[in-house]
Amino acid sequence: MPTYNESENLAAIVAAIYAALPDTALLVIDDGSPDGTGELADGLRARYPTLDVMHRQGKLGLGTAYVEGFRYALRHDYAIVFEMDADFSHDPRYLPALLAAAGDADLVIGSRYVPGGQTPDWGFSRRLISGFGNIFARTILRLPVRDCTAGFKCYRRAVIEAFDLDAIRLEGYAFQIETVYQAYRKGFRIVEVPIVFPDRKIGTSKMSRDIVAEALGYVFRRRLGGGAHGARRAPISHDEVASS
């Protein structure tokens, strides 16, 4: 779970994660937050023995944080790996549902755009930008996924092992699209489960125009440059997951 200036959310989100999955292990990756998020995370370790904290020097970005987290998970031999935000836009109450869906899938996406998914706090312009971005990405890259830019995911270890982590130099939406793209092109089974995605109530959003521009440019470059090789396999539909 990457963090940057999330001191107001951290204690509550950590407590909610452990309430949802008591036997989990949690890694907080803090990019030198000036508000003391990293130090607060260190202090929580006494209460949560399976909580670990990675301190990075400076704001190095979401994509590199997840790559570091993936490497950590591989080193520690974790079979299942989640990624999520620390601001409660990704509600920990959905963690058991994502984990259950991983019984029939390799990558599970907490999706805003399958039936049952919602973005209740978004205005028209944000819905338009996000909706267009997802249609654009899945059309250009031919991805059978409704929510290509989702950042709430559950991976089986084999998916992360198949990623070329050394080659990933992306942030934000582009990073999220790339993980879906690589998983699909390498033949892994992908499912989407619906989530309600509220806006953060505390703290400041990290979204920027640069992140959106990076994602648009990445999609074009990925399409023009080919992609990861591997046999395609049709993903399990969200309807199959909902009925399981």
Give names to the regions the model predicted.
Residues 6-20:
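Short, well-formed alpha-helical segments that are part of the catalytic scaffolds
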Residues 8-12, 35-44:
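Acidic helix N-cap motif at the loop->helix transition within catalytic regions
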Residues 14, 23-33, 54-55, 84:
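Short beta-strand/loop segment that forms part of the nucleotide-sugar
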Residues 19-23, 45-51, 77:
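Short helix-capping segments at alpha-helix termini
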Residues 30-39, 88:
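A conserved acidic beta->alpha catalytic loop
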Residues 40, 103, 158-159, 217-244:
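Terminal low-complexity segments of carbohydrate-biosynthetic enzymes
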Residues 54-75, 80, 92-173, 200-215, ...:
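Acceptor/aglycone-binding surface of glycosyltransferases and processive sugar-polymer synthases
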Residues 144, 167-171, 180-196:
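Catalytic donor-sugar/metal-binding loop of nucleotide-sugar-dependent glycosyltransferases
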